[in-house]
Amino acid sequence: MSFASEFKAFALKGNVVDLAVGVIIGAAFGKIVDSIVNDLVMPVVGAIFGGLDFKDYFVALKEIPPGVPHALDAVKKAGVPVFAYGSFLTIVLNFLILAFIIFLMVKQFNRMKRAEPAPAPAAPPEQVVLLREIRDALRR
């Protein structure tokens, strides 16, 4: 079997194709969740915490030079090291929302999945059947 035919057999297996479709749909779904977090949830959280964009919450690890605005991008451009906890919290919230939605989807999928009936017990081998018949005949 040639290398190309082995690769073709591997790539066209159901699991690989299913995984590829899942990754593509997951990437598109991730963009939707990013939009929900960044455009809908975080502005509300920012309004609760004083109207500042939540992504701009940071702690400067060195003194900010005079004349540099107190905004994350400006401080980073000035070369000041920062602890950008607002951006981190946004990403954590994004992950939690995505994980919760995936949990709900898996839970619904498991609910819709029909319970497979238990497989019928395997028939005993012919030798066992013959030995049982002999045993039953001797008991009579």
UniProtKB/Swiss-Prot annotation:
Channel that opens in response to stretch forces in the membrane lipid bilayer. May participate in the regulation of osmotic pressure changes within the cell. It is found in: Cell inner membrane. It is a multi-pass membrane protein. InterPro entries: Mechanosensitive_channel_CS (IPR019823), MS_channel (IPR001185), MSC/AndL (IPR037673), MscL_channel (IPR036019). Disulfide bonds: none annotated. The lineage of its organism: Bacteria, Pseudomonadati, Myxococcota, Myxococcia, Myxococcales. One of its GO terms (cellular component) is plasma membrane. Homopentamer. Pfam families: MscL. Belongs to the MscL family. It comes from Anaeromyxobacter sp. (strain K). The chain crosses the membrane at residues 16-36, 86-106. Keywords: Cell inner membrane, Cell membrane, Ion channel, Ion transport, Membrane, Transmembrane, Transmembrane helix, Transport. One of its GO terms (molecular function) is mechanosensitive monoatomic ion channel activity. This is Large-conductance mechanosensitive channel. The gene is mscL. Its main location: membrane.
